[in-house]
Amino acid sequence: MIGWLHGTIGDRWQEGNRCWLLLICGPVGYELQVSESLWRGTALESPTTVHTHLQQREDGQQLYGFETKADRNLFRLLISVNGVGPQVALGLISGLGAVSLLQAMAAEDVKVLCQAPGVGKRTAERLSLEWRSRLQERWQQQGGSTPLRLVEPVAESRELRATLEALGYGPEEVSAAVAQAGSQGLDPEQPMEEWLRHCLAWLSRQAG
């Protein structure tokens, strides 16, 4: 399994709404389909680190690339949902962004989810159900008993921790991210979305 790659951009192009990079790593060039946010932030011959997912297909293999570990793990969660393929998953991440997408799934905001190309009402409902189930499992593992309230202030950090751990981050990484956000003066009464945004940004910088 190829978890991440670091190299130089040898080529970059678009085919319709699909974004592609050719990443030169030593004597090997890897062709990746990438999220739009990653593609727009690259330039030819620039050094780039890409978090990757290798997909097995009937006609071969396909590498998908992402700017952050969180985006990559979110992509894996999305494609595990019935009816959501790689293109729909990329469209959700590129169109909404990780934080807004997580917020929409947690809040069961079907209208927002349906803004992404290829996502209808039934798919949006399945996405919300799958994410809530995954998040509830993490929440219960941490001793939570009350319903999750992702749109509420972060007076209790267990909900935030459950969200970050569901994206694949370990307990120590999560603790460091939450502590860092607090040390930067983020108000405990700020909505969950703001804390999540700060934590994901910090975790992304550490991975880079």
Swiss-Prot record:
Main location per the UniProt record: cytoplasm
Chain positions covered by the region annotation Domain II: 68-146
Region annotated Domain I, chain positions: 1-67
Location of the region described as Domain III in the Swiss-Prot/TrEMBL record: 157-208
Listed Gene3D superfamilies: 5' to 3' exonuclease, C-terminal subdomain (1.10.150.20), Nucleic acid-binding proteins (2.40.50.140)
Entry-linked InterPro entries: DNA_helicase_Holl-junc_RuvA_I (IPR013849), NA-bd_OB-fold (IPR012340), RuvA (IPR000085), RuvA_2-like (IPR010994), RuvA_C (IPR011114), RuvA_C_sf (IPR036267)
GO molecular function: ATP binding; four-way junction DNA binding; four-way junction helicase activity
GO cellular component terms, semicolon-separated: cytoplasm; Holliday junction helicase complex; Holliday junction resolvase complex
Region (Flexible linker): 147-157
One Pfam entry name: HHH_5
BP GO terms, sorted: DNA recombination; DNA repair
Keyword set, alphabetical order: Cytoplasm, DNA damage, DNA recombination, DNA repair, DNA-binding
Localization (cell): Cytoplasm
Domain remarks in the Swiss-Prot or TrEMBL record: Has three domains with a flexible linker between the domains II and III and assumes an 'L' shape. Domain III is highly mobile and contacts RuvB.
Self-association state and partner proteins as the record states: Homotetramer. Forms an RuvA(8)-RuvB(12)-Holliday junction (HJ) complex. HJ DNA is sandwiched between 2 RuvA tetramers; dsDNA enters through RuvA and exits via RuvB. An RuvB hexamer assembles on each DNA strand where it exits the tetramer. Each RuvB hexamer is contacted by two RuvA subunits (via domain III) on 2 adjacent RuvB subunits; this complex drives branch migration. In the full resolvosome a probable DNA-RuvA(4)-RuvB(12)-RuvC(2) complex forms which resolves the HJ.
Function comment: The RuvA-RuvB-RuvC complex processes Holliday junction (HJ) DNA during genetic recombination and DNA repair, while the RuvA-RuvB complex plays an important role in the rescue of blocked DNA replication forks via replication fork reversal (RFR). RuvA specifically binds to HJ cruciform DNA, conferring on it an open structure. The RuvB hexamer acts as an ATP-dependent pump, pulling dsDNA into and through the RuvAB complex. HJ branch migration allows RuvC to scan DNA until it finds its consensus sequence, where it cleaves and resolves the cruciform DNA.
NCBIfam families associated with the record: ruvA (TIGR00084)
Record family assignment: Belongs to the RuvA family.
Protein known as: Holliday junction branch migration complex subunit RuvA
Organism whose genome encodes this protein: Synechococcus sp. (strain RCC307)
